[in-house]
């Protein structure tokens, strides 16, 4: 490949791979004509999809792999038996310097396990975290961790805050993003020892972070802060709840507009506004969760997305590489000294 930016792609990951993946790469090529792609997977299936588009063929190189990681494979099983899989080899391309970042719509647990093993974490980072953007009344907010770490200590949350702040500056183009820790209340005395300890460290440190204290569940939609930090268990439940609520209200609206002739007329009158709302909350627009803290750019696409959604995940990876995201995290982590724990051990709820 030339000196162009190269993105490695697990072409066999996702519900409708490789067709959806290749179609997503086609869309990404139009947005980023100077980017090249390494496609890992079954060449017999990928080749014909690429060959039909001369412009796409010019920017794609196919690397045949004999296997793919299934969606239901356990991470430990995938790591043991999947070292010749499209997922493993696409990540390995980043480690070898053949690509600047990797994108997969495959098994999340396997992707994270392999990425941690192959890429390792950045110096000073204990655990990587999964981060993504979610729509709010004010625009978008970064939320992390979304499932990589079910249990976290205070230092993990501080690291997440640092990485999330850099992520917000990079993807949202914010000069000084605001950061909050998810809690059961906004008062300083509420919550577990872990969240209060993390809050105290961020409040008392010399880190250049606009830490706003604790936020609650309803602050997610309000956009109270630009970055919401939480453990992976809470974050994953929060994300799935938000997705489920969006589907619920969408079905409520559909049922209401189908309930009578007058309601159908009401839909026709309000269709333009409803289409704007739909576009604003379209999950494909926010597809592309970043594995923060790894020594390489790794982006996870939703497995059930379509070509547009996958192209947006590719766009996230490309933007992060071009803006030197990992280098920025290294610089910020290097500023962190041992932050004192100043919170008492009593439980306030």
Curated annotation (Swiss-Prot):
Membrane-spanning parts: none
Any one of the GO CC terms: cytoplasm
Keyword tags: Cytoplasm, Lipid biosynthesis, Lipid metabolism, Phospholipid biosynthesis, Phospholipid metabolism, Transferase
Subcellular location, record wording: Cytoplasm
InterPro entries: FA_synthesis, Phospholipid_synth_PlsX-like
Catalytic activity as recorded in UniProt: a fatty acyl-[ACP] + phosphate = an acyl phosphate + holo-[ACP]
Keyword NAD part of the UniProt annotation: no
UniProt GO BP: fatty acid biosynthetic process; phospholipid biosynthetic process
EC number assigned by the record: 2.3.1.274
PANTHER family: FATTY ACID/PHOSPHOLIPID SYNTHESIS PROTEIN PLSX (PTHR30100), PHOSPHATE ACYLTRANSFERASE (PTHR30100:SF1)
Function: Catalyzes the reversible formation of acyl-phosphate (acyl-PO(4)) from acyl-[acyl-carrier-protein] (acyl-ACP). This enzyme utilizes acyl-ACP as fatty acyl donor, but not acyl-CoA.
Subunit structure: Homodimer. Probably interacts with PlsY.
Family membership: Belongs to the PlsX family.
Name of this chain's protein: Phosphate acyltransferase
Higher taxonomy: Bacteria, Pseudomonadati, Pseudomonadota, Alphaproteobacteria, Rhodospirillales
């Amino acid at each position: 490949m030339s000196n162009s930016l190269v993105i490695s792609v697990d072409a066999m990951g996702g519900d409708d791979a490789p067709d959806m993946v290749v179609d997503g790469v086609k869309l990404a090529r139009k947005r980023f004509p100077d980017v090249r792609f390494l496609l890992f997977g079954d060449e017999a299936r990928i080749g014909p999809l690429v060959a039909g588009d001369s412009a796409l063929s010019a920017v794609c190189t196919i690397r045949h792999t004999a296997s793919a990681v299934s969606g239901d494979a356990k991470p430990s099983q995938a790591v043991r038996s999947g070292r010749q899989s499209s997922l493993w080899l696409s990540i390995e391309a980043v480690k070898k310097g053949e690509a600047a970042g990797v994108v997969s719509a495959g098994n999340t647990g396997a992707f994270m396990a392999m990425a941690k093993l192959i890429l390792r974490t950045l110096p000073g980072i204990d655990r990587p975290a999964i981060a993504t953007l979610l729509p709010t009344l004010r625009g978008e907010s970064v939320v992390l961790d979304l499932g990589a770490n079910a249990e976290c200590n205070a230092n993990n949350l501080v690291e997440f805050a640092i990485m999330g702040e850099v992520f917000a500056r990079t993807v949202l183009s914010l000069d000084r993003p605001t950061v909050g820790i998810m809690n059961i209340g906004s008062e300083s005395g509420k919550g577990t020892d872990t969240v209060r300890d993390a809050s105290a460290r961020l409040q008392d440190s010399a880190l250049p972070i606009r830490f706003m204290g604790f936020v609650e569940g309803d602050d997610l939609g309000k956009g109270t802060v630009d970055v919401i930090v939480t453990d992976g268990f809470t974050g994953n439940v929060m994300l799935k709840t938000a997705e489920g609520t969006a589907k619920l209200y969408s079905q409520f609206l559909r049922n209401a507009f189908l309930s009578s002739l007058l309601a159908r007329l009401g839909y026709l009158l309000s269709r333009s506004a409803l289409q704007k709302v739909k576009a604003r909350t379209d999950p494909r627009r926010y597809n592309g969760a970043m594995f923060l803290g790894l020594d390489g750019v790794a982006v996870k696409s939703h497995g059930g997305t379509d070509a547009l959604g996958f192209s947006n995940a590719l766009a996230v990876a490309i933007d992060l590489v071009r803006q030197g995201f990992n280098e920025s995290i290294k610089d910020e982590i290097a500023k962190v000294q041992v932050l004192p724990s100043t919170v008492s051990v009593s439980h306030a709820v």
